[in-house]
Amino acid sequence: METRNILENLSCIDHSYSLSEADAFAGLSKYISEEASIRSCAKCEAALVKAHLKLRGQLTDAIASELDKVAENIDPQEVYTEEEKTKHNIRALVNVMKTKVNAEIGPLIHLGATSVDILDTALSCRMRDVTQNVVLPDL
């Protein structure tokens, strides 16, 4: 029997349909799975830090690259493990991200944002991307 990582699910009933529509599922999963949601939130947090640093005149290419790398390579399982302690998804993400950036940048992660700001912005970005990269090309 074939198995998949549950963080790649699109909904709670995916196991019933993901194998019969594997190509469609793979295309959608990159954008609307739980794993994609975590990565998208991390990208929003990174963009917020870059905005703070840019306003201060402190954003360098190296820092921007570091933030992009952290966001792209965030480990969803590590975030879930942290969430077991914090009982809060975005606080868990912020805590994990802070361990992966320079100590001087850490306090800027999530500064001035609410969890809903991050979740809604990330969702909007994912819906834009899945529409442009999966839905429209398949029409």
Describe the role of every protein-language-model region.
Residues 2-139:
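A helix-coil-helix interface module used to build multimeric assemblies
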